[in-house]
Amino acid sequence: MTGRKLGLRKRIGLRLFSDLYAEKIAEHKLRTLFWECTLRCNLACRHCGSDCRVDPGVPDMPLADFLKVLDEEVTPHNRPEDVLLIFSGGEVLVRSDLEEAGREVTRRGYAWGMVTNGLALDADRLRSLMDAGLRSISISFDGFEDAHNYIRRNPRSFEKALDAIRLIVREPRLTYDVITCVTSPMVARLEEFKELLIAEGVKYWRIFCRPGQGRSDARGYRRTVPRGAGVHKAYP
């Protein structure tokens, strides 16, 4: 059995699309730039791919150094308004100069966001960050209280993350999502967990499984990783 031959117009169209696609790949415009601004963290999560801790023994990258890279290596080759900067860690909220960093990149024309475990986020800090230009935020929230607190190794981590989520979903000026790292105990409960998020007003949920790296490569954590680790799915 042979397939139908493409007509001349379709062949030309496919060739043009192929050429345009190859051009886009070669151009590879920068849209999102992550700055891992610290390896310090106020938690010691079992699944941390960077093995972050309260005192990692590695100093934070100075803000001046990051701004120098931004000014000399990034801005000359990109339009700032086309690039979203994401501050990540570690836990970004342990940096005392986070608002200063936000103001500096905003002054340069960049939008910026952050990823946080929510433990240190309250209404006052969120207001301070937004005054410094915060545009987007992701909150890590790995399951119901038993699963989340086990992974995060802190009895208040679920409560604080949920409080942070309640703050951000009520802020219309923020783009946000909730991120869930799925472990085996949560696989069968994801549908139920989704209902909890919906009840809290969450509209954007991202789930993934972390392959073994950093502290997540430890035997005790690997036993909790379901098959299909590394798969990402987003629910708008």
Spell out what each predicted region is.
Residues 1, 57, 131-132, 136-142, ...:
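Radical SAM enzyme [4Fe-4S]-AdoMet core and its adjacent flexible, acidic
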